[in-house]
Amino acid sequence: MSPKIRETLYYVGTLVPGILGIALIWGGIDAGAAANIGDIVAGALNLVGAAAPATAAVKVNQQRKDGTLTTSPVDQVTRGVEQVLAAKQNAEAEVERVKQALESAVNGAVPQLGPLASQILNGIQPAYSQPFDPHTQPWNR
């Protein structure tokens, strides 16, 4: 169905009830005749309206074939990048939560060990990170 035919049907469906109302007010037709004409027009438009899903399906098929409904490659890439950035933010938030949980667990455990144990734990990394020098004594390494 062409756009012009659809437009015409919409106008007819809009104008007929108004014309019938004016004719009824001016006395050109009685209420029974207006109701009958209105029923006939409404029935005809309902038959046309029943074809609306088929018309819509044909129109969507045309739009799909000519590429109206497909997204451009730029839009696809943009959406993909946005999804990757969102996933990155979620992963960073998860890592931060794990870090906080570990820090709270370690910080909670160290004060319970006492000050001497804290000094030992804090000194482990510097002690093992010193380079080996065969001229130093074992007690001074």
UniProtKB/Swiss-Prot annotation:
Q: Where is the signal peptide?
A: none
Q: Could you give a GO molecular-function term held by this entry?
A: pore-forming activity
Subcellular localization(s) per the UniProt record: Host cell inner membrane
Membrane-spanning residues: 9-29, 37-57
Q: Which GO terms describe its biological process?
A: viral release via pore formation in host cell membrane
Indicate the principal place this protein occupies in or around the cell.
Answer: host cell
- Any coiled-coil regions, as ranges: 74-108
Family annotation (InterPro entries): Myco_phage_holin
Domain statement: The first transmembrane region undergoes a helix to beta-hairpin conformational change, which is responsible for its self-association and pore formation in the host membrane. The coiled coil region is required for host cell lysis and for cytotoxic activity. The C-terminus determines the size of the hole.
For this chain, the family text in UniProt reads: Belongs to the Mycobacterium phage D29 holin family.
Q: What does this protein do?
A: Accumulates harmlessly in the cytoplasmic membrane until it reaches a critical concentration that triggers the formation of micron-scale pores (holes) causing host cell membrane disruption and endolysin escape into the periplasmic space. Determines the precise timing of host cell lysis. Participates with the endolysin protein in the sequential events which lead to the programmed host cell lysis releasing the mature viral particles from the host cell.
Q: What is this protein called?
A: Holin
GN (gene name): 11
